[in-house]
UniProtKB/Swiss-Prot annotation:
Keyword Nuclease annotated: yes
Keyword Iron attributed: no
Cofactor(s) needed for function: a divalent metal cation
Quaternary structure and interacting proteins, as annotated: Monomer.
InterPro entries membership: eFR1_2_sf (IPR042226), eRF1_1_Pelota (IPR005140), eRF1_2 (IPR005141), eRF1_3 (IPR005142), Pelota/DOM34_N (IPR038069), Pelota_arc (IPR023521), Ribosomal_eL30-like_sf (IPR029064), Transl-rel_pelota (IPR004405)
Biological role: May function in recognizing stalled ribosomes, interact with stem-loop structures in stalled mRNA molecules, and effect endonucleolytic cleavage of the mRNA. May play a role in the release non-functional ribosomes and degradation of damaged mRNAs. Has endoribonuclease activity.
Taxonomic source organism: Archaeoglobus fulgidus (strain ATCC 49558 / DSM 4304 / JCM 9628 / NBRC 100126 / VC-16)
Name by which UniProt lists this protein: Protein pelota homolog
Length: 344
């Protein structure tokens, strides 16, 4: 994320920025909210100067809209911001701004501390090296790229049969390596059960030495999404780029589920969390980003977050694009790890 210009007073005002990655669009999904004013260039139909014709030509204009709806279309690589036109060549009607990577926009609003922190983090993360995780076992591999919101699967490969086992295995390794080579990344984590991961790295060292130079091997029990989670838990990512957030989220959910199973020092669901906060018992408050968006329209959920921090608790906003955040949503979207039990 690139901040072009910032004009704030008491956390209120305009920030002009340019999203540089798909991750930046995802961040904006949780920064832009109903009632904000967003400016960006867009295409609008303009009535032809030829009065005898009814056709219209498309012209590029800069419009400002008061936001009513925000949608993140990950697979279309865009953010759709819809609302009432409040500034531009016409100041009536409704329009949808399509925000894409590289497109400048301005956001005018009362900025919440969590939103400014998310923006600052996006700016810092724009220089983070990209990491690819490859989970591999005999005859099967799944690769994913580490995003700011989690791990996005990019391909899977299965070994074909029909040749000798040795030839087929080398061909399989070659196909996996060729697919990896088509992606731009700096670090590679090769993980999985058994010996396939080590043999694959040896293959890379021989055939793709540049790729192998920044590769590490990790032992995990699963291939695919479960394997990705195991990698994060082992803090391999931390050792490479010091990225702790995703690994921490996975650990927090493990602690939460363990506490639920034992009935010790946890609260989940809004009612239990509020009760725990009344006792000032919250050590870590876990909040799903989707829960935050939904509840902000109903009550002052940000007030609860501030109070928890003021009483010495830590607030962690978790992405529902990733498995730990999805699990949290299934538990009500909000939970807490407690300093002490509050139930009898």
């Amino acid at each position: 994320m690139q901040i072009v210009e910032e004009n704030l007073r008491d956390n209120e005002g305009e920030i002009k920025l340019i999203p540089e990655t798909l991750d930046d669009l995802w961040h904006l999904r949780f920064i832009i909210e109903k009632g904000d004013v967003v400016f960006a260039t867009t295409k609008r139909a303009s009535q032809s100067s030829d009065k005898l014709r009814s056709d219209k030509e498309m012209v590029t204009v800069r419009l400002g809209i008061e936001v009513e709806k925000v949608e993140f279309h990950r697979f279309a690589n865009r953010l759709r911001v819809s609302g009432k036109i409040v500034a531009g060549i016409e100041e009536s009607g409704y329009h949808t701004l399509n925000i894409t990577v590289g497109k400048e926009l301005s956001i005018i609003k009362k900025w919440k501390p969590e939103q400014l922190e998310r923006l600052r983090r996006a700016v810092e993360d724009s220089n983070r090296p990209e990491i690819v995780m490859l989970t591999i076992e005999e005859g099967y591999a799944v690769a994913g790229v580490l995003r700011q919101w989690g791990v996005e699967e990019i391909f899977e490969e299965r070994m074909g049969y029909g040749k000798g086992m040795g030839d087929s295995r080398k061909e399989f390794f070659g196909e996996v390596a060729a697919k990896l080579e088509s992606f731009d990344f700096k670090y590679l984590i090769v993980a999985g059960p058994g010996f396939a991961k080590n043999d694959f790295l040896d293959f890379l060292k021989e055939r793709y030495p540049e790729m192998a130079k920044n590769a590490v091997v990790v032992d995990v029990s699963s291939v695919g999404s479960r394997g990705f989670i195991e990698i994060l838990k082992r803090r391999v990512v931390d050792k490479i780029v010091g990225e702790v957030r995703l690994a921490e989220e996975a650990e927090y959910i493990d602690r939460l589920l363990e506490g639920i199973a034992k009935g010790e020092r946890v609260a989940y669901g809004l009612d239990e969390v509020r009760e725990a906060h009344n006792y000032r018992a919250i050590e870590v408050l876990l909040v799903a980003d989707e829960f935050l968006l939904e509840e902000r329209e109903k009550w002052d959920v940000d007030g609860l977050l501030r109070e928890v921090e003021e009483s010495g608790g830590k607030v962690v906003i978790m992405s529902t694009e990733f498995e730990p955040g999805k699990r949290l949503m299934s538990l009500g979207g909000i939970a807490a790890l407690l300093r002490f039990n509050v139930k009898g």
